[in-house]
Amino acid sequence: MLVYKKIRIYYFSGTGNAKRISYWIREFAAEKNIICNLENIDTARHNSIDIDTDTLVIIISPIHGFNYPPITLDFIRRFPKGSNDIILMNTRAGLKIGKTVTPGLTGIAFFVSTIMLKMKGYKIKGQIPFDMPSNWMSIHPALNKNTVAFLHEANFYKVKKYCDRIFEGNSVFVSYRDIVQDILISPISLGYYIAGRFAFAKSFYASTACDGCQLCVKQCPVKAIKILNKRPFWLLKCESCMRCMSLCPKRAIESAHGLFVIISIFYSTLATYLLNKLSSDFLHYPFVEKVFSFIVFFILLIFFYRIQHLFLLNKYTGRLISFFSLTHYKFWGRYRSIADAIWRQKKN
């Protein structure tokens, strides 16, 4: 028996994975004559959120650094108080080996968001991860078309299976299967949130292929790209959602792999020198030493990123920078979620 007559889905999506899951849920809801509305977290306004008490709320977002990205956590933090049933979902870097989908990791995403929502009065009825294609193009090449199609199809039927249970009011806590891995990975989640995400924010640049269309600036969900010296410049609040890299019609947005090699060389030399030069016993406490080392790395990152931006103004030094970026080469590719017609066609 169907328990819910209305569903409200709030989604955040960089390259389309979470958005695709939302579309599938709406498709299955329509088959059951359930009203299902979608709202993009990018544009949702907290002061205008008004949800009937009998509406099921679903929040879905990708995982960044084994946690929900700040834009999603901030949305949940500002979410109004209520008593609705809520299902938490995520998309988390799925891969394919043979005919098997290899799962990603959720980390602390469900744990943190569950606490925040329960404090507001909501009832958590489910925590469901979906292993949609990994899109972290700064780290690895885009998955090939066959793999992407395979993962979309596998997750489509996974959504269908869970929707049948959700619509009948059943609790679905798939996340409990991964609780050990998620606990073990939690220190990395915290490290990424406190420091790592800022380093990745400064890994993007626009190559000499950029024609100044400013699509990346307009589409950035957190307004983390500004125009400096007539070129896109990434701010520290970038969340590495990969939307800009995915959408750029010129494939001009690349990751500065060469820059991070240079910074690492300077960092290892400078940090060691300063720690040896500053003889204070206080600096040699492990925690203090790590904080000090991060500050040194962060200063170098800001400095060299600005220098790189100036070098990009010259076409010759700009091309040299691209030469040392793996994302510059065709084999690396770009990822964006595909339409259902593509994987269904491949199946037939």
Spans of model-derived segments:
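FMN-binding flavodoxin-like domain, especially the glycine-rich phosphate-binding loop
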Residues: 2-7, 17, 30-37, 51-60, ...
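Hydrophobic residues within alpha-helices
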Residues: 21-25, 29, 113, 216
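N-terminal beta1-alpha1 ligand-phosphate binding loop
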Residues: 6-25
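Ferredoxin-like iron-sulfur electron-transfer modules
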Residues: 189-219, 223-240, 253-267
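Short glycine-/small-residue-rich Rossmann-like dinucleotide-binding loops
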Residues: 62-63, 221, 249
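Short Fe-S-cluster ligation motifs
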Residues: 236-262, 271-286
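Short gly/ser/thr-rich secondary-structure transition/capping motifs
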Residues: 37-44
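Hydrophobic alpha-helical transmembrane segments
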Residues: 281-299
